[in-house]
Amino acid sequence: MILYIAEKASVGRALADVLPGERHREENCIRCGGDVVAWASGHLLELCEPEDYDTKYKAWRLEDLPILPDSWKLREIDRTKKLLHSIRSLLKNASEVVHAGDADREGQLLIDEILEYCGWKGPTKRLRLNDLTPEAIRTALKNMKDNADYAGEYRLTRSEERRVGKECRSRWSPYH
């Protein structure tokens, strides 16, 4: 089974509309013949908070800065756990994944992060959609590349996410 993972439901539905086979809508996916289209809803994972690494970081102290974990941890976002668990379950039966995140660095990060978190090691292709018309989707399906070709985008965006700066949305910033 090929598992297509879109960044959002609207893209998943547009993609399912052009795939061959009879369509069966389920709660968090659409089955198209023998394949499945699933979707995220923005980020399904977030960086763990400093206190998740060590309770001493629960209160900000200048002498503890910078906080640089040996390895960064992710955690599931409560409001999207159901989607993540659905994707994880579908991955168990997948022979291949088609990464259909948005055609930008954040879209690359979003789906790659899910695949890494779920332990997916199988073949993965990258579907870059710039338009959701049926013709544009069919063209993009014919021109997919190996997802490994976009590993640099994933690593760059992941490293930017881990920097502490003005746009930090968590307790990683003392200014939040």
Where are the language model's segments positioned?
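Intrinsically disordered, low-complexity regulatory segments
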Residues: 1-161
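Positively charged, low-complexity/disordered segments
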Residues: 165-176
